[in-house]
């Protein structure tokens, strides 16, 4: 069985050993837990963003960058691919762990979830569970975790705290922008899972999304990074699943009730209460599917350059 934690550990060790080259900072706490700051007190960068995103995917995804443009505006794009979509996206990358300890709060993702089974139902659905003495977690937070936080995470993972590694980046940072946009494929896989589709039938996946400019405000940064996928995420899925025809029209974001406005505006209208937002909005803009059993192709959704540029501040 593939170990997402063992694969991610190799990437983490590279970040830690060459922290200066990556514009990040390595810290080892008194209890032996290891942390790489990718944007809290350091600039980070594209190389760090690639490593952070690949760690989130449990070492089962590949990340690249390119320059593209939306209408007349040039901007960077992320490209993500994986040959293990269910495990890498749902079993690792999904931000399925709310980390709380004392006054500390962070959204947790990455392969450590596969040890702590956060949430357990996800791993039952995809039929995956990791076995590893080491754990690697990715934390989306403005602050680095202390020893108490790392102790709690290690306990939930069932490992010794000195074998726990964490990468940390704020939403409002370059690495933060990169890693959230790097979830473009995950949003498609997650949406299909929520619709009741067996995501283990997806054999390969690839996606791209624009990387938005970093906002000074964390809530606005959350808006732009979500909009990158909601309004301009383009995904290609390869699968053996003739029954995909029953799910097609519900995949893209333009089928949700909140579609058509930048996410920050929707969030503000909902009094910044996530529970008032139609969760079907968290989907890619456009998806193509190659169904191998019958050799058919499908295309749903479309990008929305105007809302994307408005969200990013160019309109």
Swiss-Prot record:
Its EC number is 3.5.4.27. It comes from the Archaea. Keywords: Cytoplasm, Hydrolase, Methanogenesis, One-carbon metabolism. It is found in: Cytoplasm. Coiled coil: none annotated. Pfam families: MCH. CDD domains: MCH. GO terms for molecular function: methenyltetrahydromethanopterin cyclohydrolase activity. Pathway: One-carbon metabolism; methanogenesis from CO(2); 5,10-methenyl-5,6,7,8-tetrahydromethanopterin from CO(2): step 3/3. GO terms for biological process: methanogenesis, from carbon dioxide; one-carbon metabolic process. It catalyses: 5,10-methenyl-5,6,7,8-tetrahydromethanopterin + H2O = N(5)-formyl-5,6,7,8-tetrahydromethanopterin + H(+). It is an enzyme of class 3 (hydrolase). Its main location: cytoplasm. One of its GO terms (cellular component) is cytoplasm. Catalyzes the reversible interconversion of 5-formyl-H(4)MPT to methenyl-H(4)MPT(+). Belongs to the MCH family. This is Methenyltetrahydromethanopterin cyclohydrolase. The gene is mch.
